[in-house]
Structures are given as C-alpha cells and as structure tokens.
C-alpha cells in the first residue's frame, strides 16, 4: 500500500466492526481487515470495507482477487502492472491504536443501563475481541469473567468462540454467571447464553 503511494493507518489487532466504524467516522477511503473470521487461522483472507463502513461491492472484491491471482493481464495490461510510487510520493505507515480506542469509547457510549452487579461471561475465541470486550464491559460496571482470551496467532476459533458455544454454556453455569457472550475470531458474530446456559437466539437479541 505505501509503496503504491497510500498512507496506511494500523489499528493492530482489532475487530472487523471497528475497522468499519473507523473507516466511516474518520473519513478513510477504505478499510482492510486481515481475518479468518470464524474459521481456523490458515483460512486468513482479506475483508474490504468502503468509506461508508460497508462491505465493498462484489465486483470490486473480485477485481482485487484477480489482481492477487495475477489474472488481470488477460483483461487489462495497465491494471496488471500497477506502478510503484516515486520516492517523494511513497506513503507512510501510522500507528493508529487511537482509532481502536475511539471505537471502544463509541461502544461504551451506547450503554444505556449500568451493568453494575451483573456477572458477565465472555468467550473471545482467542481472537481480536480479547483486548476490547472485557474493557468495554468493565467500564459499563459488569463483573466480567473471560475465557479464550490468550491469542497466539494459531489458536483462534480453536474449540472456542461462537462456533463452539458449548464452552461458554459450561463456563456460565459452573460459575453462576448471569449472562454470557461468545464472539467469533474477528468479532462480527456474537451468540448469547442465559444464566442456565440456554442459547438466546438472534431474534431475541434483536428484540432486546
């Protein structure tokens, strides 16, 4: 990106929703998320987000995919040979942890009610929510208990998170918690369980 003249703002380990939020509110041209989503680490791919915080059109993503796979020369030689920027136009890399912190502040601002006294269980899937979810619930006043919050780059979604809700169900019941939330690796999916370990469906969450 920088070699082609773009400036890259690094949010570091963060969630897909945070990239979408920052792309929109900070007027970026686009957002890029490297993620395996709810899959194993070796399925890492690229999620492309437009300046409105929405998923880019399918045709745009297919164009990028063809460029990566070196297929574009068949259709358009100019696209296939994108030039590097001249030295004076090379982009810069910016450490933008402040953007992730801004997203966390936004989440906290959405809290209408205090969670004081509520025992909340979180399953972070050893993914990108590990350094966000607990901090948000703590500020909202919850007594927060967390599992699968030690990512090492290989253990993401490994018998953890929203695709393995049984782990959170057991954790909530055994520790007498009031509610539990399980995220997938990039935290754009969430499942909820009640104090008895029953899964709260998406319809119920939407209603709440």
For every predicted segment, state its role.
Residues 21, 67, 103-106, 183, ...:
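Aromatic side chains
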């Amino acid at each position: 990106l920088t070699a082609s003249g773009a400036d890259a703002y690094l949010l570091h380990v963060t969630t897909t929703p945070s990239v979408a939020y920052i792309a929109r509110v900070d007027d970026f041209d686009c957002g890029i998320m490297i993620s395996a989503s709810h899959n194993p680490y070796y399925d890492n791919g690229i999620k492309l987000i437009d300046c409105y915080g929405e998923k880019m059109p399918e045709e745009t993503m297919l164009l990028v995919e063809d460029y990566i796979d070196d297929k574009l020369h068949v259709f358009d030689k100019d696209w296939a040979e994108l030039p590097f920027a001249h030295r004076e136009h090379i982009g810069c890399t910016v450490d933008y942890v402040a953007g992730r912190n801004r997203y966390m502040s936004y989440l906290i601002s959405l809290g209408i009610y205090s969670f004081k006294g509520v025992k909340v269980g979180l399953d972070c899937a050893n993914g990108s929510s590990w350094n966000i979810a607990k901090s948000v619930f703590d500020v909202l006043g919850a007594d927060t208990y967390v599992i699968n919050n030690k990512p090492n780059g290989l253990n993401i979604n490994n018998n953890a998170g929203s695709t393995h809700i049984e782990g959170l169900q057991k954790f909530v019941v055994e520790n007498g918690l009031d509610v539990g939330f399980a995220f997938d690796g990039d935290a754009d999916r969430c499942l909820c369980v009640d104090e008895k370990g029953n899964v709260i469906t998406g319809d119920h969450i939407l209603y709440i």
